[in-house]
C-alpha cells in the first residue's frame, strides 16, 4: 500500500491539478524525478536546472499538502505497480527474499510483500489510501534535503515558504519487533531453484537495531572481518578446500529496531555437494571471532580510511546525494546525515561484541540456491520453486564444532597510509606528460597532478607483444595466464584494496595491461 501511495502522489495536487503537470515541468527544465519505498520509509527525489529549482519546490511540496489522489487514474497507477512487479518475476534476488520472508516471525512487517500487484491492490479504495496517507504522512515524520548553487540562507527561506504548510499530525514513529527470526534449536534450510545458473549458500542472522552505535561501526567491523579475503580468512580456507569461489558478508539496518547480517558464498560444484561443510566453516569463523578480543588495530584502520575517504573521495551530487542523505534522516540526526559513513569515535568493543553475540545457531536461516535442488512448494507471488526443512540432529552437530587453526583474524594491514597530506604545489593547467625514459623496448612517461592536488598516484604499464603473435590461441592462453595471476595475488591484493589501492592485470589488444591506482604516501 505504501508503494502504491507513492505512485498516486504524482497524479496532481489542488494547486497543480494536471495529472502530468509535475512531470512536464521536470522535462521542460532538464530534470527527472523518481521515488522508492523501503521497509520503513518512502523516499522522493529529483534534480532539475538551478533556475527552475524554486518552482519545482513549490510543486513538489504540494504532494504533502494537498494531493488529489485522482480516482480516474487509479487503474493506471495500479498497472504501473503491476509492471514493476512483473519485470522482477525472474529476478533471483526478489524471488529468494520472497521465499525467505515466509519463514520470518509470523506477523512481522518483514514478512510483507513489498512491491504490490493487481492481485494484492485490486480492492484498495481511495478511502484506504487517504487513511494511510493521514496515518503516516506528517511533518514530524518527514525530512527534507535541498542541494543547489543558491546560498544556504536562500534555501532555508524556500524550505519554510513551500513546506511550512505540511500538517503536523504529531504521529509517533512506528516501532517494530527486533527479532524477525524466531529462535529455534534446529537447522533451518531453504532450497531454491533459481532462474539463472548460480550456486549460492546464504547464512542469515537477525540483529537488533544499531543506529546509535554509528561511532563504533560494529556492523562494518563484522562485515569486514567475515568478508575478508586475505590470509587466514574464511574465503581463503573455502578456496583451499575447493568449496567456494567467492564470499560476501553484509550487514544492514532495516529500521531503527532491527537489522541483519548475511554471509553469501558462491559455491563450486564440490561446495554444492558439501554445502554442510561450508556451513560448518562459516560458523567456525564466527566461533573464532566470538572467542577473540575485538581487533583494535582493525578498527583504527577503518577509521583512518574513513577519514581519508571523507576528504578525498567523490561524495556524489544531485538526486543520488540528496536521496541518500534523506534516507539517512530516518535513522540519524540532521547534523550528521552526510557524514555517517565517515564518523568514528574511540574504539568501543561493547557494540561489536553485542552484535557478534547475535550470530547464533538458533536464529540462523540458511538458503541454498542452485539448479536441481529438491523442491516441494511454489511461492505465491513469483512462482519460485523451493523446499524447507528442519534438522535438529545437524543443529546439535553444529553446536560442537572443532576449532580450525587455519581461521584467524587478519593481520594488521601494511598498506594503510600512516600519513597523507595534500600535495604542496601550485595549481596549473599544464598537464602534458613528460617522457623521462626513451630506450629500445622501454618508454616511460610521467605526469604530475597540478589540477586536483590529491595525494593519489596512478601507475600504468603496457607490455606489448608483436602483433603476429597475437593470434586466437595466444590470446586465450594470455587470458588464462592473467586469470591465474589475479587469483594467486588475491590474498596479497585484498589488504591493498582495503587501503584504497587497486590494481588491474588484464590482457588487451596489444598485450598485457597492468595498472596500480590509489593513495600515495607513507
Question: Model-predicted segments: where are they?
Answer:
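M16 family metallopeptidases and their MPP-like homologs
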Residues: 1-4, 19-63, 94-119, 141-147, ...
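Sec-exported extracytoplasmic/periplasmic mature domains
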Residues: 9-14, 27, 31, 61-69, ...
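Short, structured secondary-structure elements
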Residues: 39-43, 76-83
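An aromatic/glycine/proline-enriched structural segment found at the starts
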Residues: 106, 114, 143-199, 295, ...
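Short helix/loop capping segments that flank catalytic or ligand/cofactor-binding pockets
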Residues: 132, 154-156, 167, 211-215, ...
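C-terminal regions of mature proteins
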Residues: 145, 297-450, 459
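Extended catalytic-interface subdomain
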Residues: 197-226, 232
